[in-house]
Amino acid sequence: MKTSLTLGGLLLGGTAIFLGQFQATAVPGGGDGGTASVGPDVIVGAIPDVARYAPGTYQGVEYASYAFGSTSCNIGTAQLQWQPNPSNLHPTIPQNLYRIKSGVIEQIGMSWCKHGFCALQQTLCGACTPAGSGCPTVLGIGCSDPYTASLNGAQSDLKGRGPINPSTGIFSGTYTDPAAPAGLPTSLRERVMVKRSDLDPAQNAGATYVSECAYIHQQDASGNNATNNASYRLVTVGATWSTTQGYPLTLTGPTVQQLPAIFAWQASAPNDVGVKSYDVIGDGRFLLGYRVIDNGNGTWSYEYAIQNLNSDRAGGSFSVPVPAGVTVTNIGFKSPAYMNGEGYSNAAWTATQADGLITWTCEPNTNANANALRWSTLYNFRFTADVPPQTNLGVVNMGLWKAPTATSTATSVQMGARIPSVPTPPNTPGDFDGNGVVDGADLATLLNGWGAAAGDLNGDATTNGADLAILLNNWG
């Protein structure tokens, strides 16, 4: 058994893992389509259980604290190293929580990274060729390894995300974590820390919650198998707040393997939400989700969510084209908060409207702690416009935050999304054929309707000299 588990924790966790193994389903789209990858390929096969911890108050806000279990599977053709610290030949495992509310997904919590230390050789994802007996420091081909929620929430094995390069999986096995900020309760630190108000059923009627785990591993990355490493599972929130454990969370439905949480947004409204992945050469993957909501009052809400799956270069700007004549209001931005002493800023990106674009911009990379769109996070960009979206997808642009390198030279990523349409010009009285010009063709239409209602412009139900005067006044 894993030495970090007590016997009681192992028995309870084993029951949860057993149940969770039958709550996993493979879904194509970012995965391997059911075929084995060449080389080692680690995925999240199941999110089997959840642990909750004592809530607390930080900077005047009440928070709950959670951890999610994760069962890894090696679906590749080679073994995966699972060496404990100080070696860096093991996976790191971030955990996240999202909320889908009023048709929009937002990230509301994130943990530090659990560091793997050994791997059981189980069979969640199929036939297993064990790498050894017990809990060896290698995960065999086809084998699975369960980490319970209590294990993933153990602060002794949680370390900051910052020193990890998610696109290569490389980090120092001896890196030092930042000091805890003053006043942050110990029970909250390093775990999935969530505002009570973001979970309160009275304030979140109809909301859906989404848990997510991912595995980052340098062997997986070097084998080009790193784009299927996140999986999600839906969560429900109980009605009663506990002063010792916060709100109860219950995992529901299957674990959706090899798809990050942004796909839960699409699954919640498949006819309205689009999601597409974009790979940065020499770096990692971003996913853009978009939705346009008709407000029923002559305005439309444009919602964009970008999830950084495993890009080290991060996102630093986002631009959406807006045609001339469109009235834009309610420009907004949302990002999850860093609160564990990482030093990262939580400042909102600056929004500007100029040169036919709405652009949100992060501080430049001269500030190493700027609020860039870092890996395993999801940021939101939104506005309201007085025109519907154009029929075809338009081009939006995400700028990369870190400078180009010799192997990753791009400075931005073009993406497809729904964008505002060109406003319909107002109808000019006398322009019968709607071509935007009052000309001879329109005059002929009016004259052909003389004495009848066909050429009427002033609403008196007959075509006469008054209508002709209106047409001639708008000539050209």
List each language-model region with its residue ranges.
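Sec-dependent, cleavable N-terminal signal peptides
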Residues: 1-32
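Solvent-exposed N-terminal domain segments of exported/luminal and surface proteins
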Residues: 30-31, 35-238
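Beta-strand-rich extracellular modules
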Residues: 214-216, 384, 401, 474
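Short beta-strand elements of extracellular/lumenal beta-sandwich folds
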Residues: 292-312
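Solvent-exposed beta-hairpin/edge-strand motifs
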Residues: 317-346
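Alpha-helical segments with a strong preference for the paired helices of cellulosomal dockerin domains
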Residues: 432-454, 460-476
